DNA sequence: ACAGGTCTATTGTAAC
DNA sequence: GTTACAATAGACCTGT
């Protein structure tokens, strides 16, 4: 039998690390392996039925090891806990007895306080393990990098402290004697370890350079010494890379895959080359050089490795608050946590409650299969909660970084638990557990690239409610009273629902989101806690840095890349508020067109990056002789060597287009495999779509304006060239935007000519995207309505489709669209127009008569900043927000304000304060007008031309 | 002083 | 990341 999770090793390690004090305590009662493993983390083991579940009791000896509480609670009560879940039926029938029961001491004790403490402070160190690498941390007290691995054989997370002797360092062009001569002899620094002479390839200078590696014992010393060295006029490199990242890059680790760690070796266990893998890769990359094909084979093994399945637990806490609308401040944690719910991936759910005078159970049933416990002592409750959470390798929260974790941590301090017994680590911008990993879904779903490319902009607000509504089709439990005033049944129901939603957001659709995270970790080479908290530019940075290290390339400094930027021809006129020129949007016609085909360039920008060898070191590099000029902007792209960005982007693009898009739809594969491949291709899509954007963003460490500028310039050239060719071929292009062309009723063979031309001339793939049976153009850019051959309706950019358009307009507009969808041939136009006219007349009258509800009149607009930060002017939604704030409601950045337009002087009112009689119909007529006009314009008529409307308007105005 | 007009800037949302 | 649109705020001008 296998050693379980290296637990034996863990014991050894503990002995060596423990202080005398801790050893002594363990002497009291040795925690058995079983105690530790008995947690719910073992997915296979069936859970005991709730009635058999018995919590360990009592906690009277707690005081021996933990300091006295601040005296807020009477000792006799604070240290005792009631009989748990098994009794909750009794509470139901005799709620009046809750108090009596809570004071009843339990007859049995299974776990002493020492065990509780031990479990809280113990760290699962191992010397060897076979497990999935999930993250790397830096442990300050050890002064070492620590691998966090999930061991599937024990179902738990283990830690492995570095034994490879890796140390923090940075690079400089100064030799040790130069530093001495310049009076910055860093070797006297207390953290200094040694100088190493290293040779690296400089990607811009295109030659090997000899550098001094200043090795230190402490990552903080890097920052300190870097300042010294650079202020003496020397160049420094790679000094701003976080140490735990440096460790991953240097050891060439791939988070998210299975490793065997032991001794000083960290070896991945990727599946050996599958027979057909070589064949597939050779086929896809047959035109690439040998090294690229070899790289591709390694990538393939990473993508093909199945994702880990690990036990997850989601949790959420509810805190008492005297002011219903305000959450207590986690930095002071002044009020008690009254409830905490957990839901795990094996289907188990628990709620722990704090006993409060006068707050009782009601008749209603409790959620099925849920273990409920009431505590007299908040401290015991929180410690138990943390203990349970820490048994899982991965804890999930919604906003845990900014609320739940800091609150619990601070609250435990307030309750007299010393910091070292509360295994929560509050980092600079996030919070986690000492022994578990933590994902905050609020941060994860706030990553814009995911929002847009992975979730198709389905949710707008970053709240648990709106995200789960959009992705799971269900929301939070609706409350009629503030959390602090709920009876216990409702509190349990509400709290638990939040925990369950949180869990489900990660696990729905066969672990879609979790698997996506794993895939992104593997690609970016960053740990799970980094990936889930950083924007895509950091993901790409991880991948690029890792790749630089693999090639033994020096990672250039911002300044070095910046220099190439100014070396460029730079002819483009400076555009106001913009850094560079973007894409072309063709002027659309006004009218209705039948049989319009849409062609688009498959991943235009990434393809251009690949085809044109665009990378920070290939554009405007003076160390390259053989260059080719980018039209319009005049940047010169190197042809002598292959760039790093385009190689990576090109590889991901090819994998996606040629392999994984197909695999995700391959019916011969098992459902689970297909879903995985869909995740793989989605992750690649996120990457390649962002690959162009990051070069134009200062936040990206390899920021290169010439690259971004060249991409868009080439995009324009390609679109223009294709347009010209279309004219030659007598194709009628009606519209186009960035990478698409709308062609009116083309002969089929001519279309093929165009596709061939694009392939030949630009090496790009032009694909048929859609065929519209009919399409309406309003004459506005990015604004059309089409009906495809299959009868699907495609609406782009129209006012009626925008999220800030009142609901009734959307409803009425979609009725109009239904009428329109009958449109098949030109002869239908007249009849349909007549029908539309009727409908619009009705709508007009309905608005004037206000037949809609207040909610339907609501305009929903997001606050892009906190209300007080609007200093230039005060938009309507901000005015409405301020009215709400006067009532004590706090509104902040990211919140959506619902308001109606009113007749009073201010002109707006939040829906919460408005009545239907406040609504100004005249202002809504204007709104309706713009919405429908975008449809009517295609028919060649304007709003005023709709007969009757004008008459009615006058009539109503006159009266 | 102020109503009503023009013009520009700000803001939010969407397409790509 | 840029391009594009709608709605509106606020500055400025003009006529009374």
Swiss-Prot record:
EC number from the UniProt entry: 2.7.7.7
SUPFAM superfamilies (alphabetical): DNA/RNA polymerases, Ribonuclease H-like
Reactions that this protein is recorded to catalyse: DNA(n) + a 2'-deoxyribonucleoside 5'-triphosphate = DNA(n+1) + diphosphate
Record key words, sorted: DNA replication, DNA-binding, DNA-directed DNA polymerase, Nucleotidyltransferase, Transferase
A molecular-function term among this protein's GO annotations: DNA binding
Keyword check for Electron transport: no
Database matches in InterPro entries: DNA-dir_DNA_pol_B, DNA-dir_DNA_pol_B_CS, DNA-dir_DNA_pol_B_exonuc, DNA-dir_DNA_pol_B_multi_dom, DNA/RNA_pol_sf, DNA_pol_B_thumb, DNA_pol_palm_dom_sf, DNA_pol_type-B
PROSITE patterns assigned to the protein according to its UniProt record, in alphabetical order: DNA_POLYMERASE_B
Alphabetical list of PANTHER family matching this protein: DNA POLYMERASE 1, DNA POLYMERASE CATALYTIC SUBUNIT
Protein name as annotated: DNA polymerase 1
Organism: Aeropyrum pernix (strain ATCC 700893 / DSM 11879 / JCM 9820 / NBRC 100138 / K1)
